[in-house]
Amino acid sequence: SIADPDCRRKVTEKLNTERLFFSNRDFIGSFIYEKRLNLVFRYYHENLLSLLGGVYLVEFADCKRAALGLIAACAECGAGADMGVLLLNDRNINITREGEVQFNYFLDFSQWQPGIEEQRYYQEVAQKVFGILELNYKGKYETPDSYPGEIGRF
């Protein structure tokens, strides 16, 4: 829930004019209660990628599928660049046993920076994608430059 009046106003404006999250199948709606704006999303059990990625993504092909899934999830979430950066927090990215990527929406609006350039958002998405792709190589090689060809190209 968002208590800060300025932040609440800006998010409400985005909901109404930019249709923030409306293309997101997980977005249920929003409401105001006791001067707080509440955004309601479908909840997924927390299977954090940061904790379970190495367990569920055993082969490079699994990592590649999950990386593409993260790109698709970012494209489909309807968040835009400034909210999208908030979604990329490790607490929000889940991985299923099948390698599907899902978001939880624990958005920390104290970290929200309206007007973030899309380029920065794309760079952060790319960093997360590379983090998924390198799951099976990190720790086995001294530097990313020494990764084998299949990941080295990325």
What are these regions (language model features)?
Residues 2-66:
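Conserved structural core of kinase catalytic domains
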Residues 2-5, 44-46, 73, 98, ...:
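Generic structural motif
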Residues 19, 78, 133-136:
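Conserved NTP-handling cores and scaffolds of large molecular machines
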Residues 38, 43, 66, 76, ...:
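Broad hydrophobic/π-residue packing in well-ordered secondary structure
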Residues 67-71:
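Residue(s) on the long, well-ordered alpha-helices that form the structural core
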Residues 72-84:
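Protein kinase catalytic-loop region centered on the HRD/HxD motif
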Residues 83-85, 90-154:
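C-lobe/activation-segment region of protein kinase-like
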